Amino acid sequence: MAQVKRIRRNISGIILLDKPLGFTSNAALQKVRWLLNAEKAGHTGSLDPLATGVLPLCFGEATKFSQYLLDSDKGYETVMQMGQTTNTGDAEGEVLQTRDVTVGRADIEALLPRFRGPISQIPPMYSALKRDGQPLYKLARAGEVVEREARSVTINRLELLECEGTRARLSVGCSKGTYIRTLVEDIGEALGCGAYVAELRRTQAGPFALAQTVTLEELEQAHAEGGNEALDRFLMPSDSGLQDWPLVSLSEHSAFYWLHGQAVRAPDAPQFGMVRVQDHNARFIGIGEVSEDGRIAPRRLIRSE
């Protein structure tokens, strides 16, 4: 008997998942997509299986704006294990070196200012960056080490929360592209004892905070009680990740032309930059960019939700 193809739902919005330990970001996405029975889905930047915390999952029209969440600042809490280094920079790797830990809280506090602000990082071999089409982590697993260019990132916040024995808990606020494993390794080297990431939890992604997240267990429970549609209450609007952007309202006439690809003027538009756009019914219809002549050019449009 032929298997009946599952008809997926055309739904749009964002679910803020507290990614569980041990899941890849894609595995978590596909699990939630299955629970929702959503037609289209995407996430906004990978979290390592070791990491937990804020993972915005985009569905339907919201996937058009996932890049802007990917580009946003992030926040983390991490536990730094001092005295050892591993080949992956975290607790899942093989120990490469063990050293005595002769530093304490005061030493760490004195060192942290060196790592605040703009810094340079060399991406780790165990990362998803590609060389000639191959992810670096695959090369690393094959025993290869290739040269990586340093990249500039910004550490907006770096605070020591706790220090006990050979472990220290740090709070980090950073720009996109920052590798917390590399940051911890570099701090460990500067302390003279080496270090790796023992725990990692993302506390913020753009405007989204940990307190807004839902767990996989909560989603599974809702699905068990009410099916796919029971999860719809967890969906946030597609423009939730853009709330810090200026909002521009268009008249019915202007919205018609804007939705057909034409730049239009709006009385409440800023002088420059990206904006959220809504129609005369206060319905989000896409994002635009204010051009030099003051008109708003459409950049990403959404279908009626």
UniProtKB/Swiss-Prot annotation:
Responsible for synthesis of pseudouridine from uracil-55 in the psi GC loop of transfer RNAs. Belongs to the pseudouridine synthase TruB family. Type 1 subfamily. Keywords: Isomerase, tRNA processing. One of its GO terms (biological process) is tRNA pseudouridine synthesis. It comes from Pseudomonas putida (strain ATCC 700007 / DSM 6899 / JCM 31910 / BCRC 17059 / LMG 24140 / F1). InterPro entries: PsdUridine_synth_cat_dom_sf (IPR020103), PsdUridine_synth_N (IPR002501), PUA-like_sf (IPR015947), PUA_sf (IPR036974), tRNA_psdUridine_synth_TruB (IPR014780), tRNA_sdUridine_synth_fam1_C (IPR015240), TruB_C (IPR032819). Its EC number is 5.4.99.25. The active site is at residue 48. One of its GO terms (molecular function) is tRNA pseudouridine(55) synthase activity. PANTHER family: PSEUDOURIDYLATE SYNTHASE TRUB1 (PTHR13767:SF2), TRNA-PSEUDOURIDINE SYNTHASE (PTHR13767). Pfam families: TruB-C_2, TruB_C_2, TruB_N. This is tRNA pseudouridine synthase B. The gene is truB. It catalyses: uridine(55) in tRNA = pseudouridine(55) in tRNA.
